Amino acid sequence: MAKGEIVTVKIEEMDFKGYGVGYCEGKPLKVRGGILGQRVAVRVKKGKKGRAEGEIVEVIERSPFEVESPCPHFGECGGCTYQNLSYENQLKIKKDVVLKLLEKEGIKDFEFLGIERSPKVYGYRNKMEYTFGTDREGKKALGLHRKGKFYDVVMTDKCNIVDEDFTKALSLTFNYALEKNLPFYDKKTHEGYLRYLVVRKASKNGELLINIVTTTQLKHKFDDLVELYRSANFSSTLVGVLHTYNDSWSDAVICEKLEVLYGRDYLIEELLGLKFKISAFSFFQTNSYGAERIYSTVREFAGDVSNKTIFDLYCGTGTIGIVMAPLARKVIGIELVEEAVFSAKENAALNGLENAVFIAGDVSKKLREIKEKPDIVVVDPPRSGVNPKALEDIVNFEPEKIIYVSCNPESFARDLRLFVDKGYAVKKVKAIDMFPHTYHVELVGLLEKS
């Protein structure tokens, strides 16, 4: 296969990043946007490490699994990958991807508990970051990036994976911006005022938080927009409207200064009967109902922990540790980001938990300073997986159980193999669909000392 060549392939499988995979001349060809069962003409591009990738030029034969997407933005918006597959087929693809990666790493003789459906298939997201910009025709837009494009924005005012209140906030804000003739930020010239609209909702608690992110290139009072929000017929309770100043050139929401225009700068969510304070910038799982399924699985895998010490590694804002603390003797959480540790301590206090301790620092370093020995270690690392030094230290503690929570099937399978090589056995694996209509899947694995 030469770069630029157009070849015809049948998509025979899906990979863990949502690419379709076909075979040409006996070699795999990754196809962005390809669907299992399709026959497509593909223009070859060279991918990383010599692996071939390609883009679809023409769909010659539709997939038998393909359905009409219920979302008018699908195909143009970069938010979803599987809107044109039935939900049952989405689940099957994710399950097959997980099992194939585990098989590749030689993980066997374990109980696979299948993939659990998301409790909500539509309207499940509790946070969205909308971008102010222009569409491919140069018209002003507020929404998500166009698929594969850095500068173009798609006006996603009919998105079906978000709550209706998000769409209402988006429309109100967009129309207000047009009426006031406020300049939208241009990422090419770094000029303009309005950058992002961030909306968060406590799905279980019904609280709504709206954050308008701008540069400092203009001075504008949003009093009338706040009144529009307050008088809007939201199904949620509006608890706060914020104004964040962000002059950074990076394409990310960075808080350089924060003003509370109305109410408070946080909302309260409830999971498994526990309360969590979520600020405008806190990390929190974006599917609250799905998060409960993950944490319930961690509890189930841990078993009776009434006399156990649990280490919660890469603990973030401490959600897993806080969920385990009411049942355990003691929980020790470690997280690199100091702001996240502050939130973890705050949430532990909010729930009256005195047996949960959270430490700021690098996991691989802090593990060597802790004198206590864990009975159970829970790891929920970043997508790259567990740091090799930290993995060695975890094994040296000789915990009776290791519970591995992951958002990346590839690093999950790789790290399970490393734990197996160091004397642990994989007992159970469960997949949980946190993000319907995307390729993402969450995993929980149970390992026990051999």
From Swiss-Prot:
It is an enzyme of class 2 (transferase). Its EC number is 2.1.1.-. CDD domains: AdoMet_MTases (cd02440). InterPro entries: MeTrfase_TrmA_AS, MeTrfase_TrmA_CS, NA-bd_OB-fold, SAM-dependent_MTases_sf, TRAM_dom, U5_MeTrfase_fam. The keyword Protease does not apply. SUPFAM superfamilies: Nucleic acid-binding proteins, S-adenosyl-L-methionine-dependent methyltransferases. Keywords: 4Fe-4S, Iron, Iron-sulfur, Metal-binding, Methyltransferase, S-adenosyl-L-methionine, Transferase. [4Fe-4S] cluster binds at C71, C77, C80, C159. The keyword Iron applies. GO terms for biological process: rRNA base methylation. GO terms for molecular function: 4 iron, 4 sulfur cluster binding; metal ion binding; rRNA (uridine-C5-)-methyltransferase activity. The active site is at C407 (nucleophile). S-adenosyl-L-methionine binds at Q285, Y314, E335, D380. Coiled coil: none annotated. Residues 1-58 form the TRAM domain. Transmembrane segments: none annotated. Pfam families: TRAM, tRNA_U5-meth_tr. Belongs to the class I-like SAM-binding methyltransferase superfamily. RNA M5U methyltransferase family. This is Uncharacterized RNA methyltransferase TTE1797. It comes from Caldanaerobacter subterraneus subsp. tengcongensis (strain DSM 15242 / JCM 11007 / NBRC 100824 / MB4).
